[in-house]
Amino acid sequence: MSAFWAEFMGTFLLLFVGNGVVSNVVLKQTKAAGDPGSWIMITTAWGLAVYIGVVVAGPYSGAHLNPAVSLALWLNGDLTAGQLGSYAFAQLLGAAAGTTLNYFFY
């Protein structure tokens, strides 16, 4: 897998899983709506979403999963300008795809 697709998939899964659980807990028509332990579900799911994203993207790209992280690494000299552009573009596309799919599910 290329670094571009690793960042895309990692960011996609991060946003899809994290926002999916928030949607499931917050939206009134779902089974988890109004559950007093909902904050535990949300925080645990976001932690797992980060873990899943890192496991998927880590071996191929370092699992930045955020354009701000990639920018900081570029400013530090750890990424080239081409890598920064590729990573940031993949992350933005992955975030948009994960959020859009979540929107259509809920």
Where is each model-derived feature located?
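Membrane-interface helix-loop junctions and terminal tails of multi-pass membrane proteins
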Residues: M1-Y106
